[in-house]
Amino acid sequence: MKNITHINKDNKPQMVDVSKKRITARYAHAQSTVVFPKEITSRFVNGDIASAKGPVFSTAIIAGVMAAKKTYELIPFCHPIGLDDCELNINLDEAGAAIINCICKVEHRTGVEMEAM
């Protein structure tokens, strides 16, 4: 069986030691699709959903970037990294589904896949 990086030789959870890795440019792109029911798609105006509390997708973009910056606080064993860039976009396709893309970049010893997701 292949070694699982977050389990040590004593079968205990551990954070991966990245101290000996070189600092390199890291990039991750995550994409998700959210399909809405008709009663929601009928509320789309100019590519967003207007609500009493403001534009839903714009608020989601802000919250998504905030979450990417705090990934290490939310997922055990993620390394704290200072993102160099986090670009989050939400676009509607012809059927009214939201296509969500997040691209994260950093120069670090570890990747940014979890932050992008």
Q: Where do the model's predicted regions map?
A:
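C-terminal binding/interaction regions
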Residues: 1-79, 84-117
